[in-house]
Amino acid sequence: HESEAPITRTVVTPISPPTDLHLEPSPDFATLTVSWSRSPSPGITGYRINTALLLGIRLHSGYTLEEEVTESQSRVCIFDNLSPGVEYNVSVVSVKDDQESEPIWKTITQEVPSLTDLNFVDVTDTSIDLRWTPLKGPTIIGYRVTVVAAGESVPIYEDKVGPTQGYYKVSGLEPGIDYDISVITLVTDGESAPTTLTTADCCPTATDLRFTNVGPDSMLVTWSAPPSMVLSSFLVRYVPSKNEEDAAELTISPSDNMVVLTNLLPGTEYIVSVFAVYEERESTPLTGVQRTGLDSPTGLDFSDTTSSSFTVYWMAPRATVTGYKIQYHPETGGAGQKEERCVPPSRNSLTLTNLTPGTEYVVSIFAVNGRQESVPLVGQQATVSDTPTNLEVTSSTPTSMSISWDAPPVGVRYYRITYTETGGETPVQEFTVPGDRSDAPIRGLKPGAEYIITVYAVTGRGDSPASSKPVTVTHKTVVDKPTQLQVTDVQDHSIQVRWMPSSTPVTGYRVTSVPKSGVGPTVSHVVPPDQTEMTIEGLEPTVEYVVSVYAQGKNGETEPLVETAVTNIDRPKGLAFTEVDVDSLKLVWESPKGQVTTYKVTYSNPEDGIHELVPAPNGDEDTAQLHGLRPGAEYTVSVVALHDDMESQPLIGTQVTAIPPPTNLLFSQITPTSVTVSWRPPNVQLTGYRVRVHPKEKAGPMKEINLSPDSTSAVVTGLMVATKYEVSVYALKDSLTSRPAQGIVTTQENVSPPRRRRITDVTETTVTITWRTKTETITGFHIDAIPAGGQNPIQRTISPDLRTYVITGLQPGTDYKIHIYTLNDNARSSPVTIDATTAVDSPSNLRFLTTTSNSLLFSWQPPRSKLTGYIIKYEKPGGPVREVVPRPHPGATESQQSQNLEPGTEYTIYIIAVRSNYKSGPLVGKKRTDELPRLVTLAQPGQQGRILDVPSLVENTPFISQTSFDNGNGIQLPGTSGQQNIGHQGQQVFLEEHGFRSPVLPTTATPVKPGYQAPEQHTLDKYTPGQHVPTIREDIELARFPPRQIDMDRPTSHDSGPQQVDRTGQEAQTTISWRPLLETTEYIITCHPVGNEETPQQFTVPGTSSSATLNGLTRGATYNIIVEALKGKNKHKSRELVTVTSAAHGSGVLHGLEDTCYDITTGSSYSIGQEWERMSESGFKLWCRCLGLGSGHFKCDSSKWCHDSGLNYRVGEKWDRSGENGQMMSCTCLGMEWKGEFKCEPHEATCYDDGKMYVGEQWQKEYLGAICSCTCYGGQQGWRCDNCRRPGAGVTPSADGVVGQTLSHFSQRYQQNANFNLKCPIECYLPL
């Protein structure tokens, strides 16, 4: 049979699930432990545990926790962080590879945890504080606090707090009520069981019970009241612990926390309780136990006292005792020898033996109960003494002494006495005296030796004597003392004494001094035995001292020899000067020791002598004020203390008064970087000034300038723009510095100067200028036009809109420096400068004075310009233009033309003023020459015949060869020949002339025919007309000689000569005559002025003359006139005479004014020859003399003074000045012989090097890499350097190659030869 194929099916049986699923939450419900039993299926590889949140009847997949474990691991799984109060489905399946069994599952709800450590931390009558530890968990949302009164069910208080809070204060409670307080943990869907506490008391209990001051029948009980509760009272109950029937209680005020319990039983234990009472309720008691102390025995008594024993009695205390303890010890020094005895409670007495005789004992009795002791009962008792007392030395000599003592209260057989020298150098001596004696002598001792004497009282039987405690005394035998103590000298701090020496040998003397009043230190000194005199120092003034002198031996000293003395008054100390002012001083001093009644203060200086201050300072003062002193003067001040008739030594000091500061501090010429400071100098002799300038409101460098004493201004440069500066000016005198004159100045803003300035037009009195500016704020322009001489500058401030300006009011033919500034409020720019020269103005007022047939004499008014000459041209109609040669000098105002002029011809005259390369427009005039003259014969006075004289030609007139001219102002002065350099450092000699003075014509000498008499007028005058060219004519007497006319335009005849007819009478007319000599070709007339500085005048007349009229000499001047006849080359003196000139006369001549001079500067009039002083406008001091000249003319010059830096110095006066390089120079005024010059030499005490000043000191400077030492010698010696050392080298460099010698290159002594310079500007004024 064939079988069918089997049908096969594979069936896998399901895996069995685990069994015995068990869920175990932790006590705090924080974790869940899941456990199970293994699946019975084989091959299980592991288990999967799933915990899912169950919401309603469904699982919430979003809240699932899953864990897997292998078969080899324990079948336990722990889940944490489960939310309390939530229901979870926990399932477990068996896993075999990829197969899973059916799950086994259970549901569980995690309990909400309750608080476990809730407690009270503070309980008061109305509040309770709660504290707990917050639980951790994401579902805990907080805590609810519930308060329920005890016995009630409805809460009276409920509140919620956050999940992290662990503290809560329950307030608003009523005192005396019990409360149940619960705290419940809240979660999202539930809450925990409540944790409840109940307040057990109606009110809090007192604390800190203490017992102090416990005695046998009392004790002090203290406690601490409960906080934050107002109680009604405290109740204190106390009762013996063994007898509760004797309980007692006390009610205490609630404000008290202590009570004293009294009337207690000694040695008894008490139970003490303290209750806090609120209304009628009591708190839990605060209880303690304390035993009272034992009471002490009483009635202490002593009896049966001997030298070595006594008996003690007492009475028993109330408390029960177990015995007594008795302690005793000597009162003095016996605490360490304390003895102790104990007796039973039945005893009440005790005999103490073996005590020390004559000793006070302290006895203490204690009641004892077990270990407890009472306060001791204390008493004192002394044993009987057997020792002598009060041992003393009753008398002593150098070799013996007597002693005595008091006997003891016991029987004494005899006394044993010993004595020996201190130090143990001699053996002990001993003797006895009977027991009924209480004194004894000791002999055979050494003088001045110290002995120890001891006395013993001997008691007892003779075979066993008992010696008492000894009594001892020390004594020194006396030494022979000195005699005749005398006080020989007394000072304020010392006393000198002398004495006669001791008759016995001594080792020295001790001298002491003690204030008799007892107040003050004792001074003691020891001197050798051969000295019998001493000065005691260090004493107080005006104190009475007791002076003692002791003679000293080897073993001691004698009784003192005593004398008293009073020390003198002490002098003041510590003189100091405060508040030093210009004319006053305040002085202070330290008051002397001792008594002072008053002080005498004197002060002196060489100029004023000695003065005493009145009223004198009192004795309690220590200051004084001196007034009326000289500024900058050194004073010697003396202060003397006075007391009764005593006077101290003087306290002396010196002090220099202050110098006054400069005043009237002014600031000018303020620019952005500089300022000019000026001041008024003080009225004292100074050595210099110091100017300090420092910024006021911001940081910057400080400037300091040292100036000479003649300075009154300083220019400070290098300042910061628009900066406020504080300026201080100090006056210096040697080492003294005055208080500063101070001021505040602000530099200006930086303003841009004008640009592109130029001159567009120039006339005689105007200059037109133009300029440009930057585009910035401008408030105006300032223009200064300063002439070359510096006089009368023109200043103008104009509108900011102008860029062209015409400067008017200028002087013709003058060089000007024109400065243009840009203005901005108070600030101005630096100047731009233009040099300009005004045009030369033309001469004016042409006048023809004299005409002849071949010459014209004319004059003109000179222009205001300073000229260098004139050009004079002339022409006739149809003829060429000719020029007068030589050209007239700048001071000329007239000219005579006689070359090739044609008679009866009209000439045109051109006068052109010349200044260097500049020419003025011409002054033009026309004049006709005279026709040829006719020969006229006139009758001569006193002569019968007719004589014909021919006038001499002008061409034959000799000229003075040397002429000198003025400074260009049209006035010619003698002796001012310009600047001369004679090698002196100096100044300008300043000359002035005042008063109208007509241009002077040449002096004319006129020969006079016989028979003509000319009167003389003599007028004193210093004026010298010698600068002009004199012309000489013979006086031809014509019958019809026309009178002189003032009309200058009217022509005069040839006979009148070249006379100027408008002079005012200052020229003189003098006629002289002489005896004619044969063969004389001409006569030379020389006029020598007597007593003044005029230049001698010389004239010539023809040899046929025997007399001449001299015109043009100074009126009133004295001349020595010499007439010499010239024969070929030989001269023969014809006549010599001295005469005083007189004024010219004749009709039509104007006579001079009154001969006085009026000076408008001084406002005074002066007679002819009178002299006076005045100041020039430029600061020179002048010496003036009235000349008159008929016009009030006077002449001034500065030759009697030296002028320097605005100050004037007389001849011989010296002063200091600062040189151009800053060095100090010493100057001396030389005076008239040097024409106002002064000589300056290096200052005798100062040296200058590299801009620094040194005064008698040394400094170092570098030369060729070496350091040289320089020394200032001053004056002509200067300074020199030597001792040059090169650092690190041993060779000293030298300019001449010689090692160690003074460097010749560096031995500068700046021996500047005295430089003398003479500048003589002349200023002349011509009043209209």
Swiss-Prot record:
Q: Which InterPro entries match?
A: ECM_Regulatory_Proteins (IPR050991), Fibronectin_type1 (IPR000083), FN3_dom (IPR003961), FN3_sf (IPR036116), Ig-like_fold (IPR013783)
Modification note: Forms covalent cross-links mediated by a transglutaminase, such as F13A or TGM2, between a glutamine and the epsilon-amino group of a lysine residue, forming homopolymers and heteropolymers (e.g. fibrinogen-fibronectin, collagen-fibronectin heteropolymers).
Q: Does the keyword Disulfide bond apply?
A: yes
Domain Fibronectin type-III, first and last residues per copy: 1-14, 17-112, 114-202, 205-295, 296-386, 387-480, 481-572, 573-660, 661-754, 755-841, 842-933, 1054-1145
**Which GO terms are recorded in the biological process aspect for this UniProt protein?**
acute-phase response; cell adhesion; regulation of cell shape
Role:
Fibronectins bind cell surfaces and various compounds including collagen, fibrin, heparin, DNA, and actin. Fibronectins are involved in cell adhesion, cell motility, opsonization, wound healing, and maintenance of cell shape. May be involved in osteoblast compaction.
Please identify the protein, giving its name as recorded. Fibronectin
- This chain's source organism reads Pleurodeles waltl (Iberian ribbed newt)
